[in-house]
């Protein structure tokens, strides 16, 4: 593309670029909405085959509804301690699992109910924090450092 030499050239260039820029903007919006749909529909338990032709407004409304259903503590600005953060994450995961697991046909209903009950029993109230954080991964051992002046090759002498 060449640089405009006159004001008319600049106006013509803008006129030609405007539809291109609008097309790119719409493509970005549509791609983001498609990704949002793929993320939110499974969390809401909606069938993807039935919802393949959702309108953009429907996707945005479902996303807003999903975010409103989330506990407000997830979005608070104060950073919780590691134990509280772990417990909140555990509870959020359990709540999501309780919504999704019954609709899933992978497990028998009795097994699903037993699993959920077991996980609920592992949930600890805020009053008795007996649940500890999972152990941090052990650091990888560092390779031995050869003494200065020696080569990296092994020699029998």
Curated annotation (Swiss-Prot):
Residues 13-70 form the bHLH domain. Keywords: DNA-binding, Nucleus, Repressor, Transcription, Transcription regulation. The keyword DNA repair does not apply. It comes from the Eukaryota. A motif (WRPW motif) lies at residues 154-157. Gene3D superfamilies: Helix-loop-helix DNA-binding domain. InterPro entries: bHLH_dom (IPR011598), HES_HEY (IPR050370), HLH_DNA-bd_sf (IPR036638), Orange_dom (IPR003650). GO terms for molecular function: DNA-binding transcription repressor activity, RNA polymerase II-specific; protein dimerization activity; RNA polymerase II cis-regulatory region sequence-specific DNA binding. PROSITE patterns: BHLH, ORANGE. Residues 124-157 are annotated as: Disordered. GO terms for cellular component: nucleus. Residues 86-119 form the Orange domain. Its main location: nucleus. It is found in: Nucleus. It holds the Pfam family Hairy_orange. Residues 132-149 have a biased composition (Pro residues). The keyword Chloroplast does not apply. Transcription repression requires formation of a complex with a corepressor protein of the Groucho/TLE family. Transcriptional repressor of genes that require a bHLH protein for their transcription. Has a particular type of basic domain (presence of a helix-interrupting proline) that binds to the N-box (CACNAG), rather than the canonical E-box (CANNTG). This is Transcription factor HES-2. The gene is Hes2.
């Amino acid at each position: 593309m060449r640089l405009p030499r006159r004001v008319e050239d600049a106006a013509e260039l803008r006129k030609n670029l405007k539809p291109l820029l609008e097309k790119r903007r719409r493509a970005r919006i549509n791609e983001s909405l498609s990704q949002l749909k793929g993320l939110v529909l499974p969390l809401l338990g909606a069938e993807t085959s039935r919802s393949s032709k959702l309108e953009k407004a429907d996707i945005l409304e479902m996303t807003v509804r999903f975010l409103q259903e989330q506990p407000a503590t997830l979005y608070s600005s104060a950073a919780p301690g590691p134990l509280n953060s772990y417990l909140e994450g555990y509870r959020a995961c359990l709540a999501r699992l309780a919504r999704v697991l019954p609709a899933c046909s992978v497990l028998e209903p009795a097994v699903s109910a037993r699993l959920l009950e077991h996980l609920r029993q592992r949930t600890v109230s805020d009053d008795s924090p007996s649940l500890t954080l999972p152990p941090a991964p052990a650091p990888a051992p560092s390779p031995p450092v050869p003494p200065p002046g020696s080569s990296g090759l092994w020699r029998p002498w």
